Design a protein with these regions (language model features):
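Short cysteine-rich clusters marking metal-coordination/redox-active sites
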Residues: 938-941, 954-957
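Residue-level signature of catalytic and energy-coupling elements of molecular machines
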Residues: 759, 842, 950
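Hydrophobic alpha-helical membrane-spanning segments
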Residues: 691, 695, 847-855, 949
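Acidic, low-complexity intrinsically disordered tails
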Residues: 8-15, 708-748, 856-940, 948
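Short Cys/His-rich "knuckle" micro-motifs
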Residues: 947-951, 964
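Extended catalytic cores of very large enzyme megasubunits
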Residues: 1-804, 813, 830-832, 932-935
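Phosphate-backbone binding interfaces of nucleic-acid-interacting proteins
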Residues: 775, 782-867, 872-874
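Short Cys/His-rich micro-motifs in 6-15 aa windows
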Residues: 958-964
Length: 964
């Protein structure tokens, strides 16, 4: 471990002890006399990133230099996001060496200037070890460090900011300005609005106050304007209101009401998709909302008591409400539109190290950083899979000592960064330098658990996650105490000495009683116990350099830059992933963690090969040959046939929270079928378990999201044995006859539809038999003579001949929907707002026009009217007195009307979509499950994003909707 060398006293002290001269830095990975760059094989790569919606080139830089072992996606993201200088100029960075040098040399110089190191040799070891860790993707700083450090622009290193607003117009207008400046810099901010008096209180002039909800409109509009002014991602923003604020019900309902507006506007034909032209007219869409609840309120909910809402001016109770009813309204709103989230105030402040300097009122947008108002936090995340030692034969161990040494290295670097960092406001700069908040965390927890044979929702999985977290934070505070001996404790420590030591004791006590599970976590717990003993001993002697040490961030862009399989504390998305290949192209691969887990659990290589092959074909482990049923849970993922339950996510959060200084960025995903009671259970049980904050997201609760097309299974149970026998008989009779072509008459009814898919215009003419369904399709694209037009002509003939030989339309629909290729994207059809290709659009439109409701519902295809009905009633089916005219109602802009025609009665099994090309793992999951992942399209490159904590991350280009 790192040592300190004795020397004369320096700096302000909380106690009368002397400071030491500087840190002695021990080598972890590097070799004396050999630079880390010289131990790596380098190669040149071409980075060309396109927008898959329209084929345009988003970014291009050729000949960049990276280690040969780096994945294509990581190279693309680091080059496009983090290299500085204009492309094509001499100032443009062309090598990862330049990028890493720009950062580590700045950190080394600042460390030397502020007397962190005992000697120049220690400074050099620090530089080399930091370079090695970044080069080999062992950890990563948050994005602002990569953006700014070592460049001529301001050296902003923090991604997370908390602001404050008081009950005055001057303060409110300052809030707008400060928030805007943070957004301009690409970061996010959050604040608590509870100091602003409610709309039920009077102004000094005698009129009624506007209330915080009113002022939220201005801030929301400002954030939306800055986003539309050229940012590559939306402003990351959080607004919080205390549960005892008199305007709390209005706050809870803000997004629910706006979501109803979105539905109405969408049904009227406006473009209300995320990023659509018309969505900007709707309010409150640029922020996450959270309600700050206290124990008094939660106990009132538990006991069914009344709860008082208090005046902001006098503190008196001005209204009493039914606590359970108010809690229900929160759950209903979250069920309907995913907002508000919930934060547990007493739990948060129980773990507050600096209560004498103020309470914790707010958080950053992703809810992992929680501390004093007008402060910031710089983040870094460790790649946990880099510390798993695996001999390839099932023997595994976690490299405890190396992990602790890397934590010490990273904490030292993070603290040094505060010495040279710039901040968006003077108040934030002063407070951050005074309290020196850090946010070390990790990524790839989900991958580590699977690789070691632990189910995410299991005692063993929670024990391993808790042990690693405890060791990380314990080592961080130990290093913080060692830094305090060298350069002094944080300025606010003297005032907060006893509370800080009390919180350290709480962490240590939680570590002492935590359950141990197996041979993997037991050594980690032992090291964690030793680290917490050192924390208490050194903290009592030296104080602490940092008021906070750890958070669990979403690790969106940086997780992809480190080639992590999973972000933050999230489980794996799916068992089969999409991988880009050097030189272009891509392939689908089964997670490397799967065979690791199988070896750990004792399976032989022949069995492993068979199980992996089954997963590659089916996307899940159900009925995998030779796999024991008790091992299925190890391979449970966030999506799929065996997805992790909502409470499984909450239990993992509770297992980690006791050893995190801040909180955990986590959204608990619920299925579309979840009830309001399920939301209440998640919110209530999280409070009981000691979680600090969370949010829920029910699939398809937002109109602006792509709607799920998952087949409903409930109708299958209604099929009787007699009906099944009839079906089998019918099918047998069908296959006994040779196909006979049934040509259409000279005069045949038809309908011509104009359409636009991803900017490509076309016309579809669908002709039908007078009494027996669709018989032919003609497709004409706007550019005659083009390859696309020719292919569409040939495709039309092939489909038409197949229809006339008796191929059921539903077979074509099941095969060709969800097929993805360009052109793709937005359409001008209100029933099919997004299409993954022209073929995808054509067969969705044909299904809506020609297939009966039951058949296309089984294929997951519904009209806009049916989707609206489902949102209102929970069912897609028309009522008994309602005629099945959805095709006519929703296609009113089309001049002609098509008579409903019955299709042949032969029953076929709904087939899965044929294998297609995916661009991201999220899209691959969609193809395997036959559903649309409930996530927005990336604003930069047009691919489907996926959840990362409370945010969304684009696997294709690294863009994120959050602040990490």
């Amino acid at each position: 471990m790192t040592e300190t060398a004795s020397g004369p006293a320096r700096g302000s002290r909380a106690k009368g002890t002397k400071t030491t001269k500087g840190l002695r830095i021990e080598r972890i990975h590097t070799t004396p006399g050999v630079h880390p760059y010289d131990e790596v094989e380098w190669e040149r790569r071409d980075v060309v990133m396109t927008n898959w919606r329209d084929g345009s080139v988003n970014f291009e830089q050729r000949g960049v230099e990276f280690p040969a072992e780096w994945a294509v996606n990581a190279v693309n993201i680091v080059t496009s996001k983090y290299f500085r200088g204009a492309v094509g100029t001499p100032q443009r960075e062309v090598s990862l060496k330049q990028l890493i040098d720009r950062i580590v040399k700045t950190y080394r110089k600042a460390g030397e200037d502020h007397k962190y190191f005992a000697s120049p040799a220690d400074a050099e070891i620090f530089e080399h070890e930091l370079a090695y860790a970044l080069l080999h993707q062992v950890f990563s700083f948050n994005s602002p460090v990569w953006f700014n450090v070592g460049t001529p622009q301001p050296q902003q290193v923090s991604a997370c900011f908390i602001l404050a607003v008081d009950d005055s117009m001057e303060s409110i207008l300052d809030w707008y300005k400060e928030e805007g400046m943070i957004f301009k810099g690409g970061s996010g901010a959050g604040l608590n609005l509870s100091r602003i008096r409610s709309s039920k209180e009077l102004l000094s002039s005698g009129g009624n106050a506007s209330g915080p909800v009113s002022f939220m409109r201005g801030a929301d509009a400002s954030a939306g304007t800055i986003k539309s002014g050229g940012a590559t991602r939306r402003a990351a923003k959080m607004v919080i209101l205390d549960v005892d604020h008199p305007d709390i019900e209005d706050f809870i309902q803000t997004k629910v009401k706006e979501e109803e507006k979105i539905r109405a506007l969408r049904d009227a034909g406006f473009d209300m998709d995320l990023g659509g032209d018309d969505i900007t007219s709707v309010q409150y869409q640029n922020a996450n909302n959270s309600v700050r609840v206290n124990d008094t309120f939660m106990k009132a909910v538990e006991n069914g008591d009344k709860f008082g809402l208090t005046s902001r001016m006098t503190g008196e109770v001005i209204e009493e409400v039914d606590a359970k009813e108010l809690f229900r309204k929160m759950a209903e709103a979250a069920w309907a539109c995913a907002d508000p989230g919930i934060q547990y105030d007493d739990t948060i402040n129980q773990w507050h190290t600096c209560p004498e300097s103020g309470r914790i009122n707010g958080s950053n947008p992703c809810s992992e950083y929680m501390h004093l108002d007008n402060t910031s936090c710089n983040l870094a995340s460790l790649n946990l899979m880099k510390f798993l030692k695996d001999d390839g034969k099932g023997n595994q161990s976690f490299e405890v000592e190396r992990f602790a040494k890397v934590v010490e290295l990273v904490i030292t670097a993070m603290d040094i960064s505060i010495c040279f960092a710039d901040f968006p406001t003077q108040k934030i700069g002063e407070n951050t330098r005074a309290f020196r908040q850090l946010g070390i965390g990790y990524a790839n927890l989900g991958a580590l658990l699977m690789a070691t044979g632990h189910a995410y929702d299991s005692d063993g999985g929670r024990a391993l996650a808790g042990a690693i977290t405890s060791l990380m934070t314990g080592t961080s505070y130990k290093r913080s105490a060692e830094l305090a001996a060298v350069v002094g404790p944080y300025d606010g420590y003297a005032r907060n000495e006893q509370p800080h030591l009390r919180v350290m004791k709480q962490h240590a006590d939680a570590n002492a009683v935590a359950p141990r599970a197996d041979d993997l976590d037991t050594p980690i717990w032992a090291a964690a116990t030793e680290s917490w003993q050192d924390v208490l001993r050194l903290g009592e002697k030296n104080g602490f350099r940092n008021s906070q040490a750890s958070v669990i961030a979403p690790t969106g862009t940086i997780g992809l830059a480190m080639s992590c399989d999973t972000t933050g504390l999230e489980p794996d998305l799916a068992l089969v992933k999409f991988k880009k290949l050097v030189g272009g192209g891509s392939m689908q691969i089964v997670n490397g963690t799967v065979p690791q887990a199988l070896r750990r659990m004792g399976y032989q290589e022949e069995q492993i090969e068979a199980i992996v092959a089954h997963i590659a074909d089916n996307g899940n482990v159900i009925d995998a040959p030779g796999l024991k049923h008790e091992h299925y849970e190890v391979f449970d993922c966030a999506m799929g046939e065996r997805s992790i339950s909502a409470m499984g996510h909450v239990r993992m959060m509770a297992a980690i929270q006791p050893w995190i200084s801040g909180a955990l960025s986590k959204t608990v995903n619920l299925p579309e079928t979840a009830t309001v009671e399920d939301v209440e259970e998640v919110y209530f049980e999280a409070w009981k378990m000691g979680v600090k904050a969370l949010a829920i997201y029910r699939d398809n609760c937002k109109v602006g999201q792509p709607l799920s097309a998952k087949t409903k299974d409930k109708e299958k149970a209604e099929v009787t044995a007699k009906a099944e026998e009839t079906i089998r008989t019918a099918v047998e009779k069908v296959v006994e006859y040779r196909p006979v072509r049934k040509r259409l008459p000279k005069g045949r009814p038809g309908i011509t539809t104009s359409f636009t898919v991803g900017g490509a215009e076309g016309y579809m003419t669908a002709n039908s038999y007078p009494d027996d369904g669709l018989g032919e399709v003609f497709l004409k694209m706007s550019k005659q003579g083009s390859t696309l037009a020719g292919m569409m002509d040939a495709f039309s003939i092939a489909v038409s001949v197949g229809l006339q030989y008796g191929v059921p339309l539903e077979t074509y629909v099941s095969k060709f929907t969800n097929m993805r290729f360009e052109p793709a994207g937005m359409t001008d059809d209100p029933d099919v707002r997004m299409a993954q290709s022209i073929v995808d659009y054509i067969f969705r439109r044909l299904a809506l026009d020609f297939l009966p409701f039951e058949t296309r519902s089984a294929l997951g295809i519904h009209s806009a009217e049916e989707r609206q009905r489902h949102l209102e009633t929970g069912s897609y089916e028309p009522t008994e007195d309602e005629v099945d005219v959805e095709g006519l109602a929703q296609s009113a802009p089309r001049a002609q009307e098509l008579k409903a025609v019955a299709t042949p009665k032969a029953v076929t099994e709904a087939a899965k979509p044929a294998p297609q090309q995916a661009h991201t793992s999220a899209e691959l999951v969609e193809m395997q499950l036959g559903i649309q992942a409930d996530a927005p399209l990336c604003f930069s490159c047009g691919t489907k994003m996926q959840r990362a904590g409370s945010c969304y991350i684009c696997e294709g280009c690294g863009s994120t909707s959050g602040c990490s």
